[in-house]
Amino acid sequence: MTIADVAAEAGLSKTAVSMILNERTGTGLSQETAKRVREIAKRLDYRPDPSARALRIGTTPTIGFVSDDVTLTRYASAMIRGILDVAEENEHTVLLAETGHHPERLSGALNAMLDRRVSALVFGSMAARRVELPQLPSDVPVIMVNATTFVDYPVVLPDERTAGEAIARLLIDAGHREIALIGRRYDEDLPPEVSVTISDRFAGLDAVMEEHGLEWAWEEAFDYWAPDDGYRAAKRALSSGARFTAMVCLTDNVSFGAYQALQEAGIRIPDQVSIASFDDDEISTYLRPQLTTARLPYEEMGRTAMSLALDGNRGTDRHLVPMPIIRRGSIRSR
């Protein structure tokens, strides 16, 4: 049914019916008449034409979400769930597009969404890094989630510094003073195209160690945070003769490798060495003992980004989302 059908049955003009159904003031009609029009529209199963609405107001109740590879990774469900939940709560729909790190796909996806008159755009990345976006219209709000760009759009990122502080403090409060750090990356080796947040993670760890007058008992840097890297680094830490009762691994994947090296050497976790990590990857629950880790808050970042998009936020603020510490069995008090 069309608005003309509703108007004909109500005995009113299409303009008057449109104003009532769009809850606009100034119709000059009584509340009883407005109620009757809504009842007729419901009975006739009238649905507004989104294309007509878009032509009238310039946008649709639709948000565009474009990512580099979020939808193809294990992190997809949490971030997208957060985005979709907030959109649904506010009666909006979401268009999803994946670029696979191809610049030509990125431009095409963004243009396609702009052609559909989305009311805002959200760009998301699996790794918190700087990305290059094409020039976008100034009248469309753009929100960056787990990513930054060269334009000062609102940014939603995990609060890595506070998480680093919390992990270091957790081990120190448990009585550990000799702590190894596995997976260091230095700023000069960590361009923003790789990460814009990991340096904050190190800063938080280092700040708490310094606050307590402590130095790392063993420290090793490497370029990738894969299980093999964690395994080899932990083996070298053990063979170095360094004394440590706890270990911080920069990711759960690194922790997985460190677990293997320690357990091969007959070292019991956490009885002899406690381990804490970051990310809360699925693997953290399969390790034995289960791994204590700081969770990357993908769902909450998605929710925050969508809320900003719905608000039409055009500021330049950086919104930091807390990383909760998930306490499991890999830390023992001394």
Regions found by a protein language model. Name each.
Residues 13, 61, 119, 177-178, ...:
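Short acidic/polar active-site loop segments enriched in Thr and Asp
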Residues 2, 57-169, 173:
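Alpha-helical recognition/docking segments in bacterial nutrient-uptake
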Residues 16-19, 56-70, 178-191:
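Short beta-strand segments enriched in small/hydrophobic residues
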Residues 34, 77-81, 202:
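Short amphipathic alpha-helical segment that frequently serves as the phosphate-/nucleotide-binding helix
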Residues 43, 85-90, 138-144, 148-334:
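Bacterial carbohydrate/catabolite-sensing allosteric modules
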